[in-house]
Regions:
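Conserved helicase motor "Helicase C" RecA-like lobe of SF1/SF2 P-loop NTPases
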Residues: 494-518
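Conserved pre-motif I regulatory segment
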Residues: 17-64
Length: 655
């Protein structure tokens, strides 16, 4: 009995020591203060670290909204490393993943004198495929001379890289057309049959991850791993005792993608290309093979024409399949896949690549059949198209059951954190979408003095959003404010129409440097914005979050209207209908929470540091005229508020 009591107190003391270590790390005399220049203890940061520590101790989930400036990265890294547990850290973007692995994690490792192994793991599309490189060198590249120049740069970089991570090849643009030709996909990877298997960068990265104590991944890879494990056919990332999701607000939508199924024109074109490569290099006697691949490619191109529409379009597959031409076009693709399968079947065993292609054709055939059967309950059947490309998708309306099952079955610590999780003071929307139950919930306010540092303005006399002159009227309203601030402005739009229209208006009526999303890569736009004074960046979607511009370079953020998703979006319509059938209120239960999270992200672009000052303008009178406006305002930082543009200009001139 005495031995049992002693053992109990020994375990209790050991657990207490763990929390004490966390508290010491963040104290004024602690490890972080000693080792990290400029580190200052923050009460909110310590509270979060303690919550993560308790999640580790009791194997419970914790959900934390940590306002900008809280220091949430250190707040979860310290307890993770001190725990000694096998840890997976997942981020919403590859940019944050790289920053975490290359900057934040080494800082904490050094401060804590951490001796464990750490690893970075991305999806296979981020790594140079040696087999594809050999094929491109043998067959030639697709594209103009600039693509050839980029290939030369990749080949030179390949001689020195240790990881094969293409983001490290800084001599080529991140959107270079050579990159898709040099990476493998799940469909075309030869696996252990590949002649380059031993040197494969993906295999080596996964091996390091399996051996590491801390692995940094992203949500896409984590969800892909969940989907693979559900099938029982292996795993992409190792099991862990602690899983941390940063930028967790993105998780529900990303998880939906991976628990669904998709078929894209790119997949089909890649298939045709791979068939032609085999025909030209290994099986030159199979002339019929090349011709059949060309026929499949032509049928894919024809199908895109039958879909109709210009620019970026999204819609419901059920409605699309009402058109007989579209259904016939899909059947024609299926026929050509059957024809190719018959040809290849006679030559199985002659080429490992061809054998793999035969399997891929069978998988596409099954997927095509599923796409046509659009009646399965609980899923949204939808499509998207842009230019010559298209994608057909089957997406579950909710992942709460699948994700919630993971939480129940794995008795480990789960940490979900972001600057934007709660809506109107509650986490219900986020937790329900992921099936999170009985989690500790915590909101940590930003240490910034928003009342002094920032102004929130909903201007008076805003143009009616339903009238034809809205764009011009809004441009005229905003121009004096943007000019008074000499640019240094993000103009975040909720549609491509408004984005292009406002950019054109500013270019016509202003001497400021106007940068437009889509005219060059995201990183180059940000670089230009910072380097070229008096710039206005007009953007949508991808610039609402994950952008960190500090200091005087950015002191004005303008949002054209509340970011409600388009009511025509097929996924949203399906979620709303499902909500309605279950007795819910789609507007209050889905549309408002989604829009609040997005708005919080957009507003969060402004104040990134204690010395930042500036103005957020939201050009939507519904914030003050509709009852639901209070929900939005309650979720935003406590900035000083005004409707007077003269006060806005005066505040900016003080900056």
């Amino acid at each position: 009995m005495q031995a049992m009591v002693c053992a109990f107190f020994f375990r209790y003391e050991k657990k207490m020591k763990y929390i004490e270590k966390i508290e010491h790390a963040f104290s004024e005399e602690g490890w972080l203060s000693q080792k990290i220049k400029g580190f200052r203890p923050r009460s909110a940061q310590l509270k979060m670290a303690q919550a993560v520590g308790n999640a580790v101790r009791f194997a419970n989930p914790v959900v934390v909204e940590a306002g900008t400036g809280t220091g949430k990265t250190f707040a979860y890294l310290v307890p993770a490393l001190l725990s000694g547990k096998k840890t997976i850290i997942s981020t919403g973007s590859k940019n944050l993943q790289d920053q975490l692995f290359n900057r934040d994690l080494p800082t904490i490792q050094k401060a804590l004198k951490y001796k464990g192994k750490v690893a970075l793991l991305k999806g296979r599309a981020n790594y140079l495929c040696l087999e594809r490189l050999d094929q491109v060198i043998a067959m030639g590249v697709l594209g103009d001379k600039s693509v050839l120049a980029d290939l030369s740069k990749v080949r030179k970089w390949h001689q020195s890289t240790q990881t094969g991570d293409l983001s490290e090849c800084v001599t080529i643009a991140e959107d270079s057309p050579i990159l898709p030709q040099l990476v493998s996909t799940t469909e075309n990877c030869l696996g252990a049959d590949c002649p380059n298997y031993k040197e494969c960068h993906v295999v080596q990265a996964r091996r390091k991850a399996m051996e590491a104590d801390v692995v940094v991944v992203n949500h896409h890879l984590f969800c892909a791993d969940m989907a693979v494990k559900e099938t029982g056919f292996g795993e992409l990332i190792p099991e862990a005792e602690l899983v941390i999701f940063d930028e967790a607000h993105q998780l529900p939508d990303i998880a939906s993608q991976y628990f669904g199924q998709s078929l894209s024109s790119r997949q089909l074109f890649d298939l045709c290309k791979d068939i032609n490569v085999v025909y030209r290099t290994e099986l030159k006697d199979l002339a019929q093979l090349g011709k059949a691949a060309d026929l499949l490619q032509k049928s894919v191109q024809d199908f895109r024409l039958f879909m109709g529409g210009e620019g970026q379009i999204r819609g419901n597959l059920r409605e699309l399949f009402v058109d007989k031409k579209v259904v016939d076009g899909l059947n024609k693709i299926s026929e050509h896949i059957d024809f190719l399968s018959q040809i290849i079947k006679k030559s199985l065993g002659r080429s490992e690549t061809l054998d793999k292609i035969f399997e891929r054709l069978a998988e596409v055939k099954v997927l095509l059949k599923k796409m046509i059967e659009t009646h399965v309950v609980g899923y949204c059947y939808w499509y998207e198209a842009n230019g010559r490309s298209f994608g057909l998708h089957i997406t579950p309306l909710t992942v709460a059951d699948k994700f919630g099952e993971q939480l129940k079955n794995q008795k480990i610590a789960w940490v979900f954190t972001s600057a934007t999780l709660e809506v109107g003071g509650k986490f219900d929307h986020f937790c329900q979408r992921l099936g999170i139950q009985e989690a500790e919930q915590m909101v940590l306010q930003s240490p910034f003095d928003y009342a002094k540092q920032s102004l929130l303005c909903v201007p008076r006399f805003l143009p009616d959003s339903n009238k034809a002159h809205t764009l011009t009227a809004l441009g005229e309203l905003l121009m004096p404010v943007i000019e008074a601030n000499q640019g240094r402005c993000f103009l975040l739009c909720t549609s491509y129409y408004m984005m292009r229209g406002l950019a054109d208006f500013l270019r016509e009526h202003s001497q400021l440097n106007v940068l437009l999303q889509g005219e060059t890569s995201k990183s180059k736009l940000l670089e230009k914005f910072i380097q070229e004074p008096h710039s206005v960046l007009v953007a949508t979607q991808s610039f609402w979050e994950g952008i960190d511009v500090r200091g005087d370079d950015l002191s004005l953020v303008i949002i054209d209207k509340l970011p409600f998703s388009s009511p025509d979006d097929p996924l949203l319509k399906a979620r709303m209908e499902d909500c309605r059938l279950q007795g819910g209120d789609p507007f209050n239960d889905i549309q408002i929470p989604d829009a609040v999270i997005t708005l919080k992200q957009g507003v969060g672009r402004l104040i990134r540091d204690v010395t930042d000052r500036g103005v957020v303008m939201i050009c939507d009178s519904r914030l003050v005229m509709r009852h639901y406006g209070a929900t939005f305002l309650k979720s935003l930082p406590p900035s000083t508020r005004t409707r007077d543009l003269e006060k806005v200009v005066a505040f900016l001139k003080e900056n």
